[in-house]
């Protein structure tokens, strides 16, 4: 189905819509082993964002996911270079507890140049890749810090995973109610469980990276969880925003739903950090 609403027509004709800015809440940056990304460096990613009206990207650097002492530094540099377009998640790898402690300490180290909110708006967990469940004690310092400071946590989640599947997510949402918990990929494949989590916890949001690939799932999430609990995301540079935007515009949902997903929900989450003035 080709979207024919006013909002869709603006995007088809102009490539973007000033009345509907897009906040991409799930991105990365930099090269990755065994795959070619045509636009993986910071400047090229900004160019991609410009082409399709992405106002801001929240990302974790690829290197930070496995070498946080190096990659988080690269994330800081990128945000300092484009402060109006980028914010980062501080990547947490519980396999290196000494680095985790150092990263958390650095967030508060310099009150004159605070990393929150000038660079970071939250933490990034990648439990499936790190082989350590979100509920593991080694994650506790990060969860506690995020809960105390009411930060965003973007957690990779996947259906059937013993590390970050729905049952593990539920336990963490119960334990840390002040965290704004963004479920990366929306517990991919276990859509009913993802819907139930969004219904049961006011602090849970379903992030849509890779959801757009499954026909009918977006409509299901809008219908059963509500568009006010969904967030636009792409995994840029893994997926091009144009594909996700096209799927969103062609889905059988309303323009009000699209506004919620593209910017309203993100603006509400980001407002305590950024005030949304000039963002």
Question: PLM ranges: what are they?
Answer:
Residues 1-25, 39-56, 227-229, 242-279:
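Mid-to-C-terminal alpha-helical segments outside catalytic/metal-binding sites
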Residues 3, 135-231:
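Catalytic pocket-lining loop regions of alpha/beta-barrel enzymes
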Residues 22-27, 57-59, 87-90, 121-125, ...:
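Hydrophobic faces of well-ordered beta-strands that scaffold small-molecule active sites
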Residues 26, 49, 75, 123, ...:
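Conserved, mostly hydrophobic/aromatic
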Residues 28-40:
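Acidic/histidine-rich helix-loop elements
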Residues 30-33, 64-67, 94-98, 160-165, ...:
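Active-site environment of divalent metal-dependent phosphoester hydrolases
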Residues 41-48, 71-78, 102-114, 138-142, ...:
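A general structural detector for well-ordered alpha-helical segments in enzyme core domains, enriched
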Residues 55-56, 66-154, 160, 200:
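Active-site gating/metal-coordination segments in enzymes
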């Amino acid at each position: 189905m080709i979207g024919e609403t006013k909002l869709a027509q603006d995007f088809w004709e102009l490539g973007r819509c000033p009345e509907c800015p897009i906040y991409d809440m799930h991105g990365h940056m930099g090269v990755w082993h065994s795959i070619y990304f045509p636009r993986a460096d910071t400047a090229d990613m900004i160019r991609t964002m410009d082409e399709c009206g992405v106002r801001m990207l929240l990302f974790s650097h690829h290197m930070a996911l496995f070498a946080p002492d190096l990659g988080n530094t690269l994330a800081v540099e990128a945000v300092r270079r484009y402060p109006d377009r980028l914010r980062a998640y501080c990547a947490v790898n519980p396999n290196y507890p000494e680095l985790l402690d150092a990263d958390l300490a650095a967030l508060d180290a310099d009150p004159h140049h605070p990393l929150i909110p000038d660079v970071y708006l939250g933490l990034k967990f990648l439990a499936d890749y790190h082989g350590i469940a979100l509920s593991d004690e080694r994650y506790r310092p990060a969860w506690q810090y995020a809960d105390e400071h009411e930060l965003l946590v973007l957690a990779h989640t996947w259906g059937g995973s013993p590390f970050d599947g729905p049952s593990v997510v539920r336990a963490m949402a119960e334990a840390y109610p002040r965290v704004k918990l963004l479920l990366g990929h929306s517990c991919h494949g276990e859509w009913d469980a993802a819907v139930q989590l969004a219904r049961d916890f006011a602090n849970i949001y379903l992030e849509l990276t890779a959801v757009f690939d499954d026909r009918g799932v977006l409509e299901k999430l809008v219908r059963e969880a509500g568009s006010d609990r969904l967030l636009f995301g792409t995994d840029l540079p893994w997926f091009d925003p144009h594909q996700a935007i096209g799927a969103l515009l062609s889905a059988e949902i309303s323009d009000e739903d699209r506004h919620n997903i593209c910017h309203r929900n993100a603006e509400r989450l980001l407002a305590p950090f950024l005030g949304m003035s000039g963002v």
